[in-house]
Amino acid sequence: MLLLLFSKTVRRILAVLVLIPVVVFGATAARVWWVARQDDRPHSDAIVVLGASQFDGRPSAVFKARLDHAAALWRDGIAPRIVTVGGGRVGDRFTEAEAGKRYLATVGVTDVVAVGVGSDTLQSLKGLSELYKRQGWKSAVLVTDPWHSLRSRRMAQDLGITAATSPTRTGPANDSRTTELRYVARESAAYLYYRVFHRSSDAGPRAV
């Protein structure tokens, strides 16, 4: 009898231990999905475009979608300037930030600051926070893909920036339900990784 009771207790404990991470991941995925659908546009010190792949100064489709959205926000008077962020790889002639700045100039944006550091989101935002400290800026509207919004906002806030997100609704990250589900799953894992280790999990090839 005691052995049977012990066995049932162990099974219940194991079930709870299995269920907890499932619930945590599910709740995080719901937050990623919810924040992805929000479009916050408070008047801010700057509109910040998070970097993505560029090819010899030409923004990839993902990056171009972000830049076009940021330009539209700038024309609407959301902020007096746009800041592009993102470093480069060995052999690149341009950083992501520089490529973004060059592109924005071609579409008529007259005040762009390039912060060409960082090979992942956290490193780029650390570079941004240094610029903010030097300039005395406080607030930002972050422009990125919808599923990246929660994690990038959390990182910026942890670095002392009052951050809102206005994600792009165009580009490859928004092209199908399958793509959306894949990004939600990936970003949920990346967000949890950041909250536990306070490190970025997205070092490596940028989105194209």
Locations of the language-model features?
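Extracytoplasmic/luminal low-complexity segments enriched in Pro/Gly and acidic/polar residues
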Residues: 207-208
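Enrichment for repetitive, rod-forming helical segments
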Residues: 18-19, 38, 73, 158, ...
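A structural signal for short, hydrophobic/glycine-enriched beta-strand patches
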Residues: 29-185
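A transmembrane-helix-recognition feature enriched in membrane-embedded lipid enzymes
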Residues: 177-204
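N-terminal type II signal-anchor transmembrane helix
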Residues: 2-39
